[in-house]
Amino acid sequence: SYNEQFFGPGTRLTVL
């Protein structure tokens, strides 16, 4: 992905 932000184990916010 273009930008990936991890906020915890198994949690990911992907901004395309």
From Swiss-Prot:
GO CC field: T cell receptor complex
Keywords attached to this entry: Adaptive immunity, Cell membrane, Immunity, Membrane, Receptor, T cell receptor
GO BP annotations, alphabetical order: adaptive immune response
Localization per record: Cell membrane
Superkingdom of source: Eukaryota
Subunit: Alpha-beta TR is a heterodimer composed of an alpha and beta chain; disulfide-linked. The alpha-beta TR is associated with the transmembrane signaling CD3 coreceptor proteins to form the TR-CD3 (TcR or TCR). The assembly of alpha-beta TR heterodimers with CD3 occurs in the endoplasmic reticulum where a single alpha-beta TR heterodimer associates with one CD3D-CD3E heterodimer, one CD3G-CD3E heterodimer and one CD247 homodimer forming a stable octameric structure. CD3D-CD3E and CD3G-CD3E heterodimers preferentially associate with TR alpha and TR beta chains, respectively.
Functional description taken from the UniProt entry: J region of the variable domain of T cell receptor (TR) beta chain that participates in the antigen recognition. Alpha-beta T cell receptors are antigen specific receptors which are essential to the immune response and are present on the cell surface of T lymphocytes. Recognize peptide-major histocompatibility (MH) (pMH) complexes that are displayed by antigen presenting cells (APC), a prerequisite for efficient T cell adaptive immunity against pathogens.
Name this polypeptide is given: T cell receptor beta joining 2-1
Upper taxonomic lineage: Eukaryota, Metazoa, Chordata, Craniata, Vertebrata
Gene symbol of the encoding locus: TRBJ2-1
